[in-house]
């Protein structure tokens, strides 16, 4: 079998072996791993390997098999294996067998695992035998066998740590308990000798050049110190030796980690303080002069920076341990402060380091210190906070080698780094608001306003803008603890307002051609618009800001990122400030200046390397400009009506020309880009009108309404010519949804235009509805659009007639679409089911829109009353369907609406606000129909549907809606409903007492209490109690 194993491993590792043969080899290998016969064969191979050479691949496989079988062995087998492993180890050492690192690690891992099996009950001399093998006290650098022995020794101890001491590995309680017993046994039997051996290795000059052994030994000290006796580790000889490694470039990083592990050991506060005082690490690190070197050397070598990161981690841990001492024993404040006083220069030096990776390693200490300072102000002095604040602010500045543009990842990392610094600054502001109030304005003033414009550093100005923005946040968060009524007259508020005004009036921003400055300026202005609108005297500042926005600094910026962002910010600024624009020349110049930005150029989307659709072009952002144009024109006083009309034409006409070009292209020659261009043009029209409508309460001028009417005609002509394209239908609905508020306003004030509006909508509905390729999602959007029409024109006779003619074909088509089976690609099935559920909800919402806007008469006119039973039937059907609980709940809500308008007056529509209902005859039998169907639904749904579980919030909501439905009917029909309900419950087998109780509660309880009762009733009946 040994030969077979050898061959199988060779084939498995071969890159040229026949695939079939390779599969057979893997099957054989897996068989070997899982059988006792295979395990024994591998042990035999291992025994022979101590005397004869085998290849590395086979040896690693043998190690794997043994490793995977150790936990399955009997005690006798474990004992035997232990003997063989030690024989192998002894042979490797005596023969100086220099296996590759991965083989040595694997063998050490096996020994570590074996240790866990044998140390307590089977072979307590495990560690003693290891120590005897290495004979560290007689080790010399000229004895290679001894070096190999110690190498294996350190690897085995690292493996043992992984098995019993690594706190980052999750273990079962059983293994956790076993590990505690192993640690106890080590402490009792071998701890003293183990620690002595480590000290001997570290202090033996023979190993001075054996870096891997020393590194591993330092790691071991750090790993084991957490659960061993600390006194064994802190002899002067040991400490001095460890400290000396801080000056060894190959060992110093590990040394820092070891020292962190030593000082992190859990112990009583007083003992921890004594340990830190004894080690006196801060003073020793100071002797290395690392901080001063950083100040004077801008060209640190990489390894020096890496070492400084470890030193920073060590200093951070010292600080955190001191703070933990204070948290656990507040009486030690004086001693803690004394040690912190010695620590702060090194901490501040790390914070001030040229490399952010070094600085952020002391962040945990700073966070802990500032948090604790809130509870314990004696922990700091104002001078310390002042120094720390200055260091934090200086560190927030962009590095001199960062241009702030090229590398977005680097910039994102820095902004995240700066955000952490800012959180520390904010805490200092809370602790010492007066210090903050004195320091920050000085920084802002020096950074922005005392800068030589001809020799300006953008990084300095950017820091000033950042601090100015942060200063306003401090005011908003009331860091200065000022009464709300006095904030606007407070010193901080006035300082900020003065800075903001000074910034706007300054030429500095205009002269610094850097994206960060330009972008931050506009963000700052828009964020603090309320400082500008709070006073009439600031109107000139707003005008100046408009001019800056429309300069090459903003909307026309050469940097695309700044340019695109400024389009949105310009829109936000106009919308928030709503300036009174009565200067014709200024307004016209702004609009004319912006015209080049309003040229629409469609670009087809592409796919990226992941096959995802990527939108091209800037049209989505460009829409902010169109919306802004609409808003600007709406802000022009009505006295300047000619200017309004002129500017609307100025913006609309290029779009109309674009649409005319698109329409003129024969359908057979229309490329996708033509359709997209037409879509963008329609979207732009709708977006501009949406901007105009932002000024709520406006009375729209007849000339303006006429312009919108003309735009509506252009949109409809475009739709006629592109009716088969979904994106054109979508854009048309989008545009008309924005026209409606203006048409409605004019409709309310000018009845002669009613017919024109209804004609537009009639044509729109007809064209869209006649399209043969409508998607399910489009039906949902269309119903939502119709709901908007119902709401806005509920009193318009022409619109009523339009809807009356359309209701029946609408519902018939919708129900047909929902009834159609899924015939498309099976992969599309989830999407189609989702879209159909959305359409059901859209249908229910449309019904709700009809009822809630007092147009229920539409459902019972001569044209539509034949469809009413089908509509009500579908609503009941959706109520019963619990595969989509949201739809079910919504359907029950609509049943309540039906009950309220049809369920109480003998079939006569019961809605006094429905002006069209009076001349309509009652619907015979609808009362009885609804009563029976509602009662059936109310009890079949919770009691016959197995999935109906009141522990699920969705089903609980449905139950509450059923309670509302029952209560609504009871309020409508009173005793008549109670009688039918009582008979139903008795027929279903409910006792007379329970039936009486239910009907009595339905009659007597208010809605809130009946909902609770109904939930309780369902729970009680379903549990059988």
Swiss-Prot record:
SUPFAM superfamilies: ARM repeat. The keyword Cytoplasm applies. One of its GO terms (molecular function) is tRNA binding. InterPro entries: ARM-like, ARM-type_fold, Exportin-1/Importin-b-like, Exportin-T_C, XPOT. Keywords: Cytoplasm, Nucleus, RNA-binding, Transport, tRNA processing, tRNA-binding. It is found in: Nucleus; Cytoplasm. The keyword tRNA processing applies. One of its GO terms (cellular component) is cytoplasm. One of its GO terms (biological process) is tRNA processing. tRNA nucleus export receptor which facilitates tRNA translocation across the nuclear pore complex. Involved in pre-tRNA splicing, probably by affecting the interaction of pre-tRNA with splicing endonuclease. Belongs to the exportin family. This is Exportin-T. It comes from Candida albicans (strain SC5314 / ATCC MYA-2876).
